[in-house]
Structures are given as structure tokens and as C-alpha cells.
Amino acid sequence: VPLSSMEKKERKGFLGTLYELTRDQSVRDNPDRVETYIPPGIETKAIYYNAYDFKYPQLSKVFCPAPNYSAFICGDTPLMKITTNVKNGKKIAVVKNSMGNAFVVYLISHYEQIYVVDFRYSKHNLLKIMKDAQVNDLVFAVGMYAAVSRGTIGMMRNLAYQKNQDYDEVLKQEQAQRLLDSINGVQD
């Protein structure tokens, strides 16, 4: 999708983590901006789950009116599932910290489902989710400074061994809900 065909939103005055940590006046005098590009014709539905299980899913958004990185996928949540109107059967899991939030939105034009896992907060078993949901692709979207730390590597490794509710049960519940919705004439 060409950038020129996308709706652009710009938020000025973004200071970010560097300013938070240093309170440096030169950073404050030269704030950054957050630019959001929304592809035309792409519809999304985002649901986030708490850190430990799949109970109490909450509706969310892919684009939010925040003046910072929370403009992308509304910030950091342990696990988010984004469903789009792209019908190509492709599914991806993104393991990320906050640096990956902006990357996730670029995937909505290319994937039917996107599973976003913040390795800092999620206690879900990523391998189980990928198997149950038949995820095709996996990408790590992590800032370089964090990617090489022992703590980050340990948290990412834990995603393969953590125990939680079977995601297969969530998929069955979603399938049953879609069937009920189709009987009642409700569309996504």
C-alpha cells in the first residue's frame, strides 16, 4: 500500500523515554513528533488479554489518539489479537517491547490475524498459542539495546515454557460465537 494513499495523523510535542530519564533541556527544546499512517480499506478488531489467561478479554484499538507510542496498539498489553479484513490466511506472532508497537501497525495490510505478545508482561505460552492458532510467521520487534540483555533473553525464553489456559479453548469459543452471530445475522 503506497504511503501516499494512507491517512496521516501527526502528534507534535513528543519527548519520550530519553527526556524522561535525563530531563535534558536540549531534548525538551527539540521535541519529536509521532506520525501515524492508516491504510485505506483495512478494518481491524483488536482484543487484549491479561497476563496469565484468556479470561475477561477486552476490546482495544490498533490506532489510538495518544500523543506518544501508545498511539500504536494503545500501548503495552501482555497479549493482543488483531483480526483484519485481509483474507489471505496468513497469521503472524510479534514478540515485542514498546519499541515494537509502531511496527505492528504495518502488518495489518498483510495479515489476517496478528498476535502481539509483550514479553515483559505476558505469562502465556507462545508456542502453544502459535500451534493452536496455526500461526505462519514469527517476528521479534525489540529495540537493540534490550535485545542483547540477559533479562530480555530470559523473558523471551520463558514464553516457550509458561503454562496457561489452552488457547484452543478460546478458539472454540470464538468459533461458537461466530456461528451464533451468523444465525442471528450479526456481522463482524
Segments the model singles out, each with a brief description of its role:
Residues V1-D188:
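Extracellular glycan-modifying ectodomains
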